[in-house]
Curated annotation (Swiss-Prot):
The keyword Transferase applies. Calcium/calmodulin-dependent protein kinase belonging to a proposed calcium-triggered signaling cascade. In vitro phosphorylates transcription factor CREB1. The gene is Camk1g. It is found in: Cytoplasm; Golgi apparatus membrane; Cell membrane. It comes from Rattus norvegicus (Rat). Its main location: cytoplasm. This is Calcium/calmodulin-dependent protein kinase type 1G. Residues 277-317 are annotated as: Autoinhibitory domain. Residues 326-387 are annotated as: Disordered.
Amino acid sequence: MGRKEEEDCSSWKKQTTNIRKTFIFMEVLGSGAFSEVFLVKQRVTGKLFALKCIKKSPAFRDSSLENEIAVLKRIKHENIVTLEDIYESTTHYYLVMQLVSGGELFDRILERGVYTEKDASLVIQQVLSAVKYLHENGIVHRDLKPENLLYLTPEENSKIMITDFGLSKMEQNGVMSTACGTPGYVAPEVLAQKPYSKAVDCWSIGVITYILLCGYPPFYEETESKLFEKIKEGYYEFESPFWDDISESAKDFICHLLEKDPNERYTCEKALRHPWIDGNTALHRDIYPSVSLQIQKNFAKSKWRQAFNAAAVVHHMRKLHMNLHSPSVRQEVENRPPVSPAPEVSRPGSHDSSITEAPILDPSTPLPALTRLPCSHSSRPSAPGGRSLNCLVNGSLRISSSLVPMQQGPLATGPCGCCSSCLNIGNKGKSSYCSEPTLFRKANKKQNFKSEVMVPVKAGGSTHCRAGQTGVCLIM
């Protein structure tokens, strides 16, 4: 009977009146528009987990949560974060996730001191293996990027874990058409709003591989229109001197993944058989000095520039979408001024009070060993040749969430057991949001970014602004 109930879609959630009776809240790991992720300790077992708290709200679409849960419940792979349990209260949903505490991919590269093609090859091999598993199970991730590739533990030989299934989708007849993904990693067919398939993930892996070998993205331009055209044309280069020490095998591997025609693009299965992955062609020459320098220049980016590019991409996607509708609507979109960054976006290195307060800590419980890398990168993004880097390549813009405690001292709690401030979600000023990426971040963040952009949205005959996030198409 119990097993049958677990399989029943109406009973996959455990009911709770106070989640704090089950878990001790220890640290804020990440925040989003509709959710907060905490480091928690299970009271009965003492095990550590990442708990994603999702506030129930009319502005939040249950289908988005159901999609993420449906995806996570179907998958079990050593390189994919695991959904351990699900709870529900009158005000929240709670996803109990496997704790990923080893840090982000780029941070680990910067900490290494020595870094080779072979190191990059081993990372991509794990990613390909996990994505191949997803594809075999009819799941397309749709938002693969370095920020979603985390190390399981701080140990040197830790596995890479794929996180963030907020945009994942189970294929229907192998073809999808919703425009989503993160610009800079998104495939040409998605940016052009053409029907696409699981091949979009292979393109993203190609972009990630390119960055891992040189430290900057394959597509960058000084204007958003040129950037979009470059991606849709599939035009990129292996520029000197940044690629002089990289093997021809690595370049060949990338070319097969960054193939404009999705029908000709390498699948994960083919990529796993390439000699750069499965053979001995990945060089052991140290490329750390060049790659680490470019990563610091291009990925510790100005939040103002992140917000600008986010707005440009959302505006571009909206125009493409609305062109399919009536002439009057199309004219309204054409006349709409370009979106500008919200004035409250702070600059790199500034104090972000909205993400620093944490739930009540249990001092008797040791935190996972998390490495620290002091960073102070405030320079404007650059790319080879001295040109400015306008491509948004550092992932989805995170939304500052009212779920994060703001007050000093002990937290007040609501009826759900979470902090009372989370009850503000869905109030006046909060708008609907298509999909909320799960943020699994280690407790000590390397850069204190708070990138946000306000996007004009047409609704009910009037236009209002709401927080937008690259990586999520606001038009579905």
